[in-house]
């Protein structure tokens, strides 16, 4: 593979979190009955006129500002003409020659190496409907609930050189969208979708190779696997002296392969032209300044602050800031008195596992940040051991219980009375004379065995530090 350089550009479609569609007042709510959120405008009836949702312009511009784009004071909608059953008007309202945003970037880090990925453009457009194919009656149905739902398409420069960079770019882009609260980033529901354009060229060659566009990439893992397969496929063709065909290929996750969907000769000539039903979008400088002032702290800035202010590692800061609600949960826990590094460890282990199993976001967890802070402080004070804390965490999480009250009610406080523990230590040593003799003979690793037996005898409530101290004294 060292003979070839991989070149990848990505197109992302992000559904915006508006309450109504881009050109009509129909709801954008997901999961309703087919064709429930439909009107004459989004079903393409003749004689109707679109009315632009102003919030779409605001959200698109804010994404442009957050990614360092030039936000154009004037942008124009265009008709993208093609025929498909889920496109009732026979064209998609999009932007072409004059998009709302251009010339931005996103910074990524892969294996400790920082890189800047260019963004060619961000433009507004409407989503298409959805075709539903029924094998039972050999029919295809069209659901127009998604038709006219607002999208922004984010087109990158061909700056990525491998699947790891693509995944890092997509995660960074998704995080920005979620932090801005303009998109929920849900890949399973299709609100964050991407296509990847992949090509190879001999190392040292400036000219791009022939690209294949990969579709049906609905998870970060699928993106990684599809690109890996496609790179290998194209390399095999070139090694055999063949030529890569420009085409669109569909990723099959079950087989981990890509298959041809359509070739260059089948590619659409979309015949773009300005939409006569929509006036140019004009953004005043004062409005843009207002939107810029409303931008939240973005993931990269928050990550750097977590490292500087809380002493977290780059890795911990990256994990905690990947999701806005996790970052806010962490800050709330620290504000409630939790040690930052210990709170970070609990969040990345116990809390994250419970959140994933329950399928809930951190902001919806019954165990509040203040209660997590209380748990961390109970461990720090010696009231309970880390082992006990892990044992009770599922109950605390599921019921949103107060840790201090729960520990008191269950009698789980750590035993730190040296007299009480001394009896337990003597009992364990008396029950294991052979191990005591072996320890005194040099097998010091048996210390862990003795500690384990004492913890078992005290049901995990013995103070580990005091146990070690007493054992050292007794075995001295």
Curated annotation (Swiss-Prot):
Single GO biological process annotation from the record: glutaminyl-tRNAGln biosynthesis via transamidation
UniProt cross-references to PANTHER family, sorted A to Z: GLUTAMYL-TRNA GLN AMIDOTRANSFERASE SUBUNIT B MITOCHONDRIAL AND PROKARYOTIC PET112-RELATED, GLUTAMYL-TRNA(GLN) AMIDOTRANSFERASE SUBUNIT B, MITOCHONDRIAL
The family this protein is said to belong to: Belongs to the GatB/GatE family. GatB subfamily.
EC number: 6.3.5.-
InterPro entries reported for this sequence: Asn/Gln-tRNA_amidoTrfase_suB/E (IPR017959), Asn/Gln-tRNA_Trfase_suB/E_cat (IPR006075), Asn/Gln_amidotransferase (IPR018027), Asn/Gln_tRNA_amidoTrase-B-like (IPR003789), GatB (IPR004413), GatB_C_1 (IPR042114), GatB_Yqey_C_2 (IPR023168), Gln-tRNA_amidoTrfase_suB_CS (IPR017958)
Organism of derivation: Solidesulfovibrio magneticus (strain ATCC 700980 / DSM 13731 / RS-1)
Reactions it catalyzes: L-glutamyl-tRNA(Gln) + L-glutamine + ATP + H2O = L-glutaminyl-tRNA(Gln) + L-glutamate + ADP + phosphate + H(+); L-aspartyl-tRNA(Asn) + L-glutamine + ATP + H2O = L-asparaginyl-tRNA(Asn) + L-glutamate + ADP + phosphate + 2 H(+)
Any GO molecular function: glutaminyl-tRNA synthase (glutamine-hydrolyzing) activity
Gene: gatB
Purpose of the protein: Allows the formation of correctly charged Asn-tRNA(Asn) or Gln-tRNA(Gln) through the transamidation of misacylated Asp-tRNA(Asn) or Glu-tRNA(Gln) in organisms which lack either or both of asparaginyl-tRNA or glutaminyl-tRNA synthetases. The reaction takes place in the presence of glutamine and ATP through an activated phospho-Asp-tRNA(Asn) or phospho-Glu-tRNA(Gln).
Subunit note: Heterotrimer of A, B and C subunits.
Descriptive protein name: Aspartyl/glutamyl-tRNA(Asn/Gln) amidotransferase subunit B
Pfam families reported for this sequence: GatB_N (PF02934), GatB_Yqey (PF02637)
Keywords for the protein's UniProt record, in alphabetical order: ATP-binding, Ligase, Nucleotide-binding, Protein biosynthesis
Entry superkingdom: Bacteria
HAMAP family named among the record's database cross-references: GatB (MF_00121)
SUPFAM superfamilies xrefs: GatB/YqeY motif, Glutamine synthetase/guanido kinase
């Amino acid at each position: 593979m060292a003979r070839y350089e991989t070149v990848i550009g990505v197109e992302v479609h992000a559904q915006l979190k508006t309450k109504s569609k881009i050109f009509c007042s129909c709801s954008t709510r997901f999961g309703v009955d087919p064709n429930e959120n439909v009107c004459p405008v989004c079903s393409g009836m003749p004689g109707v006129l679109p009315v632009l949702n102003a919030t779409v312009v605001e959200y698109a511009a804010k994404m442009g500002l957050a990614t360092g784009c030039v936000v154009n004071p004037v942008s124009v909608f265009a008709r993208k003409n093609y025929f498909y059953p889920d496109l009732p008007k026979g064209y998609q309202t999009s932007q072409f020659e004059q998009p709302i945003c251009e010339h931005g970037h996103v910074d990524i880090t892969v294996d400790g190496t920082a890189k800047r990925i260019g963004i060619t453009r961000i433009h507004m457009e409407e989503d298409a409907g959805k075709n539903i194919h029924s094998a039972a009656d050999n029919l295809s149905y069209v659901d127009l609930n998604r038709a006219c739902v607002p999208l922004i398409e984010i087109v990158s420069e061909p700056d990525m050189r491998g699947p790891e960079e693509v995944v890092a770019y997509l995660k960074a882009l998704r995080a920005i969208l979620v932090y801005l609260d303009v998109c929920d980033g849900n890949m399973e529901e299709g609100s964050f979708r991407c296509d990847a354009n992949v090509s190879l060229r001999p190392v040292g060659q400036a000219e791009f190779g022939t690209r294949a566009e990969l579709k049906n990439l609905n998870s970060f893992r699928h993106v990684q696997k599809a690109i890996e397969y496609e790179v290998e496929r194209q390399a095999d063709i070139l090694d055999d002296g063949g030529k890569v065909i420009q085409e669109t290929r569909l990723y099959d996750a079950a087989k981990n392969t890509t298959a041809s969907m359509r070739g260059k000769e089948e590619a659409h000539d979309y015949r773009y032209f300005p939409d006569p039903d929509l006036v140019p979008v004009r953004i005043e400088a004062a409005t843009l300044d207002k939107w810029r002032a409303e931008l939240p702290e973005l993931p990269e800035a928050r990550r750097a602050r977590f490292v500087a202010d809380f002493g977290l590692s780059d890795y911990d800061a990256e994990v905690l800031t990947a999701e806005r609600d996790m970052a806010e949960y962490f800050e709330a826990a620290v504000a409630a008195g939790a040690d930052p590094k210990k709170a970070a460890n609990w969040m990345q282990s116990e809390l994250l596992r419970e959140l994933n199993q329950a399928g809930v976001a951190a902001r919806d967890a019954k165990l509040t940040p203040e209660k997590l802070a209380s748990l961390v402080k109970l461990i720090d004070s010696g009231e309970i051991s880390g082992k006990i804390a892990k044992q009770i965490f599922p109950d605390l999480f599921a019921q949103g219980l107060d840790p201090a009250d729960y520990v008191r009610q269950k009698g789980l406080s750590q035993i730190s009375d040296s007299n009480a523990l001394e009896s337990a230590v003597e009992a364990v040593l008396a029950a294991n004379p052979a191990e005591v003799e072996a320890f005194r003979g040099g097998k010091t690793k048996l210390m862990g065995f003795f500690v384990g037996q004492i913890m078992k005898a005290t049901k995990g409530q013995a103070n580990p530090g005091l146990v070690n101290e007493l054992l050292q004294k007794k075995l001295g």
